[in-house]
């Protein structure tokens, strides 16, 4: 089985940051990415379990994978085109 998190195009370390900082950083990072590129987000704020999927839905990016069963949380998103 392939680890979807193993080779992202970009990585964002949001450990220790609290709402709304992680999503603000995700938005800024995604803005500078090319369509189709992926971003791995590593976070420990419980609010990201709601905020990151919500951001993807609102901005129409793909939430490729998420791991939120234990810390740190990991999310992989693909920028829409």
Swiss-Prot record:
Superkingdom, natural source: Bacteria
A GO BP entry: tRNA wobble position uridine thiolation
Keyword tRNA processing: yes
Tagged with keyword Cytoplasm: yes
Intracellular or extracellular location(s): Cytoplasm
Listed GO CC annotations: cytoplasm
Record key words, sorted: Cytoplasm, tRNA processing
InterPro entries linked to this entry: Sulphur_carrier_TusA (IPR022931), TusA-like (IPR001455), TusA-like_sf (IPR036868)
Primary localization: cytoplasm
GO molecular function: sulfur carrier activity
Pathway: tRNA modification
Active site feature: 19
Family affiliation: Belongs to the sulfur carrier protein TusA family.
Protein purpose: Sulfur carrier protein involved in sulfur trafficking in the cell. Part of a sulfur-relay system required for 2-thiolation during synthesis of 2-thiouridine of the modified wobble base 5-methylaminomethyl-2-thiouridine (mnm(5)s(2)U) in tRNA. Interacts with IscS and stimulates its cysteine desulfurase activity. Accepts an activated sulfur from IscS, which is then transferred to TusD, and thus determines the direction of sulfur flow from IscS to 2-thiouridine formation. Also appears to be involved in sulfur transfer for the biosynthesis of molybdopterin.
NCBIfam families documented for this protein: PRK00299.1
Record-linked PANTHER family: SULFUR CARRIER PROTEIN TUSA (PTHR33279:SF2), SULFUR CARRIER PROTEIN YEDF-RELATED (PTHR33279)
Quaternary organization: Interacts with IscS.
Protein name per the record: Sulfur carrier protein TusA
Lineage: Bacteria, Pseudomonadati, Pseudomonadota, Gammaproteobacteria, Enterobacterales
